[in-house]
Each structure stands twice: as C-alpha cells, then as structure tokens.
Amino acid sequence: MKKLGREIDILVNYPKAKRDLSARLESKSEESRAIGRKFGFDYFDGSRNHGYGGFNYSQRFWQPVIPTIIENYQVSNSSRVLDVGCAKGFFLYDLKLELPEISISGVDISEYAIENAKPEIRKYLQVANATKLPFADDSFDFVMSINTVHNLNLQDCALSLQEIERVSCRNSFITVDAYRNDEEKARMEAWNLTALTMMAVDEWKDFFLEIGYTGDFYWFIP
C-alpha cells in the first residue's frame, strides 16, 4: 500500500495578505463565480469580484519561498521541475533566476495566462489540462501545484493527482482548499470563488491514500 506524503508548509515564507472575507462574501455571486472559473482576463486582471484584481509579478512573492523548496526537495541546476497551474509563470521565472541551468515546464488551463506570461520563460509554458499532462512517465524530479487541483470536481481531482504522481520520478507538492473546523469551513465558503472541491484536512488525506497520491501537501485556509 502506498504511503501518505508529508504535511509540510513549504510556502511558510510566502507573504500573507489580510483579506476582508465579509466584503468578498457580500460582493460575490454565482455570476462572479462563473466568470472567475473561465480563468481569463476577468479572473487575472479584471475586477476583484472575479479574481485577483491584477495578477502582476513581484519578486517579494516567490523569491523568499525558493530556498525552502531547494532545501526540501534537493532542487538544483540539473533538476527538471513542473508547475501544474503555473498561471503567468512567476514561480518558474524566479526559480530560473536562482538556478539558471534548471529545466522548467509549466502548464495551465488558461490560454490568457499563458499568452500573458513572463516573456523570458513563455517558451517553457503551455496550455494543458491537469487531468491529462502532456509529458511522459517520470519526466520530472519535482512537480508542484499550488491552489489548482481543488478547482476540479472530485473525479478530476483524482485524475490530476494521479497525473502528478505519474510524471514525477521523485518529489511533488500541492496545496488545496481545506478546513479543520466549522469556523474555517464557513470562512472557506465565504472566500471561495473557483474551487469545486473543498474538504476537511482529514478527508483530503483519506482521498490522497485512496487514489494513490504519495507526494507532499499542505492547505490553503483563509
């Protein structure tokens, strides 16, 4: 039987924003969710009601995180790294700055995000569905997917995690929307715009075991 990976917060040094959950809950509608789930301009660079309200590069986000990733997963210039749900490629851009010879790849469902990715690394990115990654088995030393898998329904969550497992020959790490109690569940429901699958942390762990995901994981809890 496959073993569960580590519950580890490798994003501990990622800047945490203070969020007005009540305001977001009041302004959110099914229409806003539908627009956000298209993952186009409106989600990345349109109104805050539909997503980020401007998804722009800043070195303060990923550069503090990269040393933790390098330390935990022995990522080096000879590594092959995949970001599933790479958006505009900001993580991979900063990783390439730190390790210029590293082999990077990124996939995202959003044509808009890939078309508007960092120009320096756009050639390494492609539009693809997380449930069918366009790579051979064991293609990568490290696969990461941040706040992406939960945007799929439960069946497709399983497929995407199995795909991460398939293309990774060493390590992987994901984060998903989760909660530990009723208060956190209520906050999650207030905050959620795009996720189709949200579970308690123990339910996620059982799910990982059930579908055979052995990589590391952590939670997004607003």
Regions found by a protein language model. Give the residues of each.
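Class I (Rossmann-like) S-adenosyl-L-methionine-dependent methyltransferase catalytic domain
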Residues: 1-73, 78-134, 152-159, 163, ...
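A conserved beta-strand element that flanks and buttresses the S-adenosyl-L-methionine
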Residues: 144
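Hydrophobic adenine-recognition pocket in adenosine-nucleotide-binding enzymes
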Residues: 148
